[in-house]
Amino acid sequence: MADQEIENAVSRALEDAPERNFRETVDLAVNLRDLDLNDPSNRVDESVVLPAGTGQETTIVVFAEGETALRAEEVADDVLDEDELEELGGDDDAAKDLADDTDFFIAEKGLMQDIGRYLGTVLGPRGKMPEPLDPDDDVVEVIERMKNTVQLRSGERRTFHTRVGAEDMSAENIADNIDVILRRLHADLEKGPLNIDTVYVKTTMGPAMEVA
């Protein structure tokens, strides 16, 4: 269960958000400090499964063949085989569009080398190289897990953002999502919470409320 202060900040962000004619996301902004982000080992690059889900549609594309491809078609947004992967490698614009429109990629391990060859220069810089799928992994379970996953990625910037829910989720559920993210950062950063300057939560168009 999240700290009450986190839930209070979320409640204020939801209450103070102006009414819009679309469903807003709830986003978290994390400001880092005392880290040399020119050193890649100090950068944040984590996938976190949110206990209450993202509250949004998550686009997932799978690279697979045979039975795995057939099962993935039940739940993935798109499934591409080896031939389609090769075609994509020859169309830079299509590859970039796919990368920009997709939240997560999953791929059978046997295709990872070809993905690196054909799409590495497109997916790598975007932090979207596929999650490898072992032969005994259940592709449906992996996809369902990734639908509730967000990416924490700072790059060289001291401030990074990630979604933590949607405006029609409860403050308690959003706070639980934030709590999981902060715990992961505290565990992974060199000096834990001392490497976090400030944290804010806000809806898409609403005011930012300080969490920590």
Curated annotation (Swiss-Prot):
- One Pfam family this sequence matches: Ribosomal_L1
Q: Does the keyword Phosphoprotein apply?
A: no
The answer to whether UniProt assigns keyword Glycoprotein to this entry is no
Gene Ontology CC entries for this record: large ribosomal subunit
**What InterPro entries does this protein's entry cite?**
Ribosomal_uL1, Ribosomal_uL1-like, Ribosomal_uL1/biogenesis, Ribosomal_uL1_3-a/b-sand, Ribosomal_uL1_arc, Ribosomal_uL1_CS
Instruction: Identify the keywords attached in UniProt to this record, alphabetized.
Output: Repressor, Ribonucleoprotein, Ribosomal protein, RNA-binding, rRNA-binding, Translation regulation, tRNA-binding
- PROSITE patterns the record matches: RIBOSOMAL_L1
UniProt GO molecular function = rRNA binding; structural constituent of ribosome; tRNA binding
GO BP term (any one): regulation of translation
Q: What does this protein do?
A: Binds directly to 23S rRNA. Probably involved in E site tRNA release. Protein L1 is also a translational repressor protein, it controls the translation of its operon by binding to its mRNA.
Q: How does it assemble?
A: Part of the 50S ribosomal subunit.
Family classification = Belongs to the universal ribosomal protein uL1 family.
- Can you name this protein? Large ribosomal subunit protein uL1
- Record gene name: rpl1
